[in-house]
């Protein structure tokens, strides 16, 4: 189901899981990393100036191969954290006095990809 992620024109911080969200889950274990549908396009649609952070449970030994895979796709990533715990990711942030909600959670099914998620910058927020 298509979904618009409606955001303010302020700069944003993106925290994205890697395996199962952007690339096929556990593909790196067989040497076959594969971008999921819409993942590269979604990453390229993130506004310039925003901070992009990837989280992965991959072991440190997979760092260079993973970073090379990301570079080869020509997407901009600012930081990648390896050996992140596999449990839930919790983000806690306030709501601005104007009512602007400063945290969003998007939880696609594993290996679904992001082709149905669109970033919309709303100048009225």
How would you describe each model-predicted region?
Residues 1-125:
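HAD-like aspartate-dependent phosphatase fold
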């Amino acid at each position: 189901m298509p979904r618009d992620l409606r955001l303010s024109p302020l700069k944003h911080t993106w925290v994205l899981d890697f395996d199962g969200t952007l690339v096929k889950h556990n593909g790196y274990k067989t040497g076959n990393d594969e971008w999921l549908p819409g993942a590269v396009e979604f990453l390229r649609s993130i506004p310039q100036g925003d901070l992009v952070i990837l989280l992965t449970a991959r072991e440190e030994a997979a760092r260079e191969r993973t970073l090379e895979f990301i570079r080869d796709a020509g997407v901009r990533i600012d930081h990648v954290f390896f050996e992140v715990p596999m449990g839930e990711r919790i983000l806690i942030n306030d709501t601005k006095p104007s009512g602007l909600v400063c945290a969003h959670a998007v939880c696609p099914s594993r290996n679904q990809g992001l082709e149905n998620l669109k970033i919309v910058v709303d100048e009225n927020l």
